[in-house]
Amino acid sequence: SPEAMRRTLDEMAHTTLLQLFKEKPEARALFDKSAGYAVFDSRKVAFILAAGFGRGVAVDRSTQQKTYMKMASVGVGITFGVGNFDNKIVILIQEQADFDTFISNTQDARMDGKAILGDSKEEASGSFVDGRKYYVLTRKGWAVTASVTGVNYLRDDYLN
């Protein structure tokens, strides 16, 4: 049911944020400065053509209004590794206007994905890049980047 799915997504988002703050304490300062955030549970299938899908929830920090969302990605190459596996994505969004755009069915075209494979200079900076910060929980732990892969984020009409 939609209610059960919303509860599951809310619990996943809460648990993922707690894990992020415990394992990457510096993320808390950016979270506190953000206008909103989104947490997705995604499954990646990555061989030559990488594809991914998932669901999540975006939260406006000023109102606590939740928007349930779907995500889908397609790219060429091995972006997240070989095989079929899950990961969690936390997106911190700095400005309210950017958050509002994000929850209004958006395609994130700023992607490069390289930082997901290892540490990056962006991780050390502790700041937003182009108004966002992405934390990706992979099998190896948290990776930090300014972007993920070419991803469509869409409002989930079934859950909203």
Regions found by a protein language model. Name each.
Residues S1-N160:
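Small-residue-enriched, tightly packed secondary-structure blocks
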